[in-house]
From Swiss-Prot:
Descriptive protein name: O-antigen export system permease protein RfbA
Function: May form an ATP-driven O-antigen export apparatus, in association with RfbB.
Record GO biological process: lipopolysaccharide transport; polysaccharide transport
PROSITE patterns (UniProt xref): ABC_TM2
Gene that produces this protein: rfbA
Segments crossing the lipid bilayer: 33-53, 73-95, 111-131, 142-162, 176-196, 228-248
Gene Ontology terms for molecular function: ABC-type transporter activity
Main location as per UniProt: membrane
Amino acid sequence: MSLKMKYNLGYLFDLLVVITNKDLKVRYKSSVFGYLWSIANPLLFAMIYYFIFKLVMRVQIPNYTLFLITGLFPWQWFASSATNSLFSFIANAQIIKKTVFPRSVIPLSNVMMEGLHFLCTIPVIIAFLFVYGMRPSLSWLWGIPIIAIGQVIFTFGISIIFSTLNLFFRDLERFVSLGIMLMFYCTPILYASDMIPEKFSWIITYNPLASMILSWRELFMNGVLNYEYISILYITGFILTIVGLAIFNKLKYRFAEIL
């Protein structure tokens, strides 16, 4: 690796850290509870879904609270990143106009910021494991980084597409909101994948978000790395990132005039 490439990678990393840190400070400025909100939101939804599906509808899934949060927490990372990415270039319009830097770092910093929030939820998962008489597995040490990197690649691919196209098609945010809500129910977060009738199994087979959620759930609940799901996550992520960067590189020269 050349000295120039090392410098470039170091510069990109420093830039990513600076922008992520800025976004965190802006988000939690004057906030009393700070990072706790990143845990409270999915936990509240988990409590609501537990009441509806376990107590009212009596869904027969063992350790249902743990089952829920191991799906909801990584989903929250993805959904928040995808939704916030729509406005990532718009929110940083002044920086983009006045400073020369790789603009693709902006949606990536958003993904990383939400990833930090996800890491804050892992102690909650550990606490519920102990509640249900279970223990974290040693495989978490390498499993969490492997799946997390895959989710970063996948989510960045989605985010760079959304953040770029939303500058030119502002109706996109409406479609994204509906799409994320639809995909939430098409992904086995509230229910087990084996509860889906055979004729609808394609919903799981062709849904990379299902592979993402099931990868985390297998790791957290069973200590297992499901390489089939992880491979789907990585392959889809690389494809989305390549497509996203192609769209970004084609349209980035018009950012200043749009913003």
